[in-house]
Structure formats: C-alpha cells, structure tokens
C-alpha cells in the first residue's frame, strides 16, 4: 500500500500560491518573520519547530526541520533532546486525560 506521505511532494508546497497568491504571500511573510532571529536565535527556533513537528506528527515538517536543523549545526544530541521533550509533553497529555477515566469510574460507583 502506498504511503500518503511522499517526501518529493514537499517540493509542491509553493503551488498553493497559484490558487490564492495573496494569502500564500501573507503566510510566507508571517512565517519568515516568525522564524528570523528575535529573542530566540534561528537555531533554537528550528529546534522548536522540529519538536512541534514530531508532537503533531506532521511528516513534511519532520522532514523539512530535520534537514534545517542539521544544516544549522544542531547536533544529533540536541535534536534527540528536543524530540524527547515533545514526546514527554505528548505522553504527559495522554496521562493527564486519564482523569476522564477516573471521572467515569466515580460516576459508576
């Protein structure tokens, strides 16, 4: 069965500009401004983006930001820690929602 995700499709990202150039341009300007150096340096922002990409399980962003981090000099150890933080937060959310099971058990008793 073919995968929904095909890394070569990432190159088609800009095609959205053909259907709504104004909105695409606004998004790209906002994105560029968000990712440039500010209170956080660009390397840190790429690391955050990588962690978020893993947390939301978005394969195109995982692919893109894995490469961007490597090109920015992010070490494998830094990437591993960032992804581990994302996993901990995601896992913590699952555990936090366990309270719903507790509430259901309380209602049943």
State what each model feature region is:
Residues 45-53, 82-86:
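Alpha-helical scaffold segments that form or flank carboxylate-/histidine-based iron centers
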Residues 64-78, 102:
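Iron-sulfur (Fe-S) cluster-binding segments and ferredoxin-like electron-carrier domains
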């Amino acid at each position: 069965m073919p995968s929904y995700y095909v890394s070569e499709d990432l190159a088609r990202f800009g095609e959205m500009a053909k259907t709504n150039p104004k909105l695409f341009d606004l998004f790209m300007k906002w994105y560029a401004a968000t990712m440039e150096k500010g209170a956080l340096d660009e390397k840190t922002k790429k690391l955050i983006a990588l962690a978020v990409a893993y947390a939301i399980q978005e394969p195109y962003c995982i692919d893109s930001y894995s490469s961007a981090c490597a090109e920015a000099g992010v070490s494998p150890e830094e990437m591993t820690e960032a992804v581990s933080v994302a996993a901990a937060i995601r896992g913590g959310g699952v555990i936090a929602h366990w309270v719903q099971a507790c509430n259901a058990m309380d209602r049943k008793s």
